[in-house]
Swiss-Prot record:
Family affiliation: Belongs to the major facilitator superfamily. TCR/Tet family.
Gene Ontology molecular function terms on file: transmembrane transporter activity
Species of origin: Aspergillus brasiliensis (strain CBS 101740 / IMI 381727 / IBT 21946)
Acetylation among keywords: no
Role this protein plays: Efflux pump; part of the gene cluster that mediates the biosynthesis of bifonsecin B, a dimeric gamma-naphthopyrone.
InterPro entries: MFS, MFS_dom, MFS_trans_sf, Sugar_transporter_CS
Region annotation (Disordered) ranges: 1-55
Name of protein: Efflux pump bfoC
PROSITE patterns referenced in this protein's UniProt entry, alphabetically: MFS, SUGAR_TRANSPORT_2
Gene that this sequence comes from: bfoC
């Protein structure tokens, strides 16, 4: 029997000497068992003995080793999440040094494009190769990209460095969640995964504050140098304390190459790049009807159809095995995470703009005013993780999170130039509560309800969908903001050039204008920012609808077992 044929299913199931499952037997067994499990799951008939979380758990850590691994993973997640937004407040200084105003969009998108593009590929790498070494390789690539960004003498070098860092970053969030799932029993995973995901959310919020502080007081290059010591600590900790070196599936190199789904990857990677470029360029750099934007959307559609067809044909060898999406808990969680993450990042990007433009805060002050969101997010992420572990239920937390997100988004959309601290502090606390309670739950779903052989791919899938939701809807919000502000300026202040006002940035308003003109511009900025919050309201409401399909059934494994 050829290697490729064996991948499609062997005659019997067997385990390797190292404890990993053979690829040829895995495919046949997973297809049969997962089909049976999915059917029963949809009917709500899966009992505790049948659930995959009853599998024997190995590699569990305790004591100081678990503490060290958790700290190391948090350092790594902190850095990779910082890179999503830290460059925003450093852009003016970077463009001034490199004389590269036309490259501004690439400073953020280069990292985002490569991160989203390779996340699913890392899911397959984590399936066929030891998690430890794949993770350390991704961390090395991320650190290399950060180093290039720090030392680069040109704008092109910065863009290339950001792209390289994104290649590594695409494997670090899902890898961190996989490592922690290997280190703790399934009953405790929600608590630990919740804490790690809270670090991701917190870093996304405070990144602009750190970027502004580095730019103002040291150098913008420290936005990237900061990753080096944190990454080194993470690498040392994982290298010496995490000893799980067995791949999920044992296979020959040729079988691994086929199992990595090269055809699917060849259509997926350029397809995602086309989608993200189209959403970032459309309405901002080029009109939506521009031939380049239309061509990108068309190419994305063609590549998406090809990718779906290849996934259906490849089945168990696919980047995303189709059976994973049959269970309503999985696709419901994916849709929920996509929408909730889009809402969250809309506020992460535009609340600081409201503080700076409407209330006259500096970049550093706006970061400080975001602390209610940061603190409440961390507190309730930890609390929700513990409560999920204690109660064993996921659905109620998703519904509560989405409902509170809808309410807090609605309240934030009522902000006015005259709004006091009590309003924006209270609304942010409520928003932090909603995000903290539910942001990480889609990861809980895949790590507590799927077989261990599916967890790497499913974790990468959920991570990718959440990142994609943030990337797409931030671009949509940006277009809504620019279009609304430009339209209002042309209508109310026709003597001003809307492009000049927008490009000057929110922190420059009070230095360029005064009197009645400034008062009017502040009101127009307020309206434009609030306009993006309407998008967040819709996304939060959509996440609530998605949460309603999640089954209210206790997790497979009770606490303490």
């Amino acid at each position: 029997m050829s290697d490729t044929a064996r991948i499609l299913g062997g005659p019997s199931a067997s385990s390797s000497r190292d404890g990993g499952m053979e690829l040829n037997s895995f495919t046949e067994v997973s297809q049969t068992n997962s089909r049976s499990h999915s059917t029963k799951e949809e009917e709500g008939q899966v009992d505790d003995q049948q659930r995959p979380a009853r599998e024997e758990e190995t590699g569990v850590l305790g004591g100081y080793k678990l503490v060290l691994v958790t700290i190391g993973l948090c350092f790594c997640i902190f850095c990779t999440s910082l890179d999503n937004t830290i460059v925003a407040t450093a852009v003016p200084r970077i463009t001034q040094q490199f004389h590269s105003l036309d490259d501004v969009g690439w400073y953020a998108s280069a990292y985002l494009l490569t991160t989203c593009a390779v996340t699913l590929t890392f899911g397959r790498l984590y399936t066929f190769f030891p998690i430890k070494w794949v993770y350390l390789s991704a961390l090395l690539i991320f650190e290399l990209g950060s180093f290039i960004c720090g030392i680069t003498p040109s704008s092109l070098g910065l863009i290339l460095g950001r792209a390289v860092a994104g290649l590594g970053g695409g494997g670090l969030l899902s890898g961190s969640l996989l490592i922690i799932s290997q280190c703790v029993p399934s009953a405790r995973r929600p608590a630990f995964s919740g804490f790690i995901m809270s670090i991701f959310a917190v870093a996304s919020v405070i990144a602009p504050l750190m970027g502004g502080a580095f730019t103002d007081h040291v150098s913008w290059r420290w936005c990237f140098y900061i990753n080096l010591p944190f990454g080194l600590v993470s690498a040392v900790v994982i290298l010496f304390t995490f000893q799980h070196t067995k791949p999920v599936i044992q296979a020959s190199l040729r079988e691994k190459a086929v199992g990595l789904d090269p055809l699917g990857t060849a259509t997926f990677l350029p397809g995602i790049v086309c989608l993200l470029l189209a959403t970032q360029w459309g309405g901002a750099q080029y009109p939506w009807g521009d031939g380049r934007v239309v061509a990108l959307f068309v190419l994305f559609g063609v590549l998406l159809v090809c990718f779906i067809g290849l996934q259906l044909w490849a089945r168990e060898r696919a980047t995303v095995p189709p059976r994973l999406l049959r269970g309503r808990n999985i696709w419901g969680s994916a849709l929920y995470g996509f929408c909730l993450n889009g809402a969250m990042f809309t506020f992460v990007y535009y609340l600081p703009i409201w503080f700076q433009a409407v209330q006259g805060a500096s970049a550093t002050e706006s970061g400080i005013r975001n602390l209610p969101l940061v603190i409440s997010n961390v507190v309730f992420a930890i609390i929700s993780g513990v409560l999920v572990s204690m109660t064993g239920y996921l659905g109620p937390f998703m519904l509560l999170s989405a409902a509170m997100a809808s309410i807090s988004a609605g309240l934030l959309s009522t902000l006015q130039p005259s709004s006091g601290a009590g309003e924006w502090i209270g609304y942010q606390v409520l928003l932090g509560l909603s995000i903290g309670v539910g942001f990480q739950v889609p990861i809980f779903v895949v790590q507590t309800t799927l077989a261990s052989t599916d967890i790497p791919t499913a974790t990468a899938l959920m991570t990718f969908i959440q990142l994609l939701g943030g990337a797409i809807f931030v671009s949509v919000a940006q277009n809504m903001f620019r279009n609304q502000l430009a339209t209002d300026i042309r209508t109310v202040l026709p003597m001003l050039d809307p492009t000049a006002v927008i490009n000057a940035g929110p922190t420059s308003l009070r230095g360029m204008y005064s009197g009645e003109t400034l008062t009017t511009l502040v009101a127009l900025y307020n309206d434009a920012v609030v306009h993006t919050f309407y998008l967040a309201i819709g996304l939060a409401a959509a996440s609530f609808l998605a949460a309603t399909v999640i089954q209210w059934r206790p997790l497979a494994k009770a606490v303490g077992e």
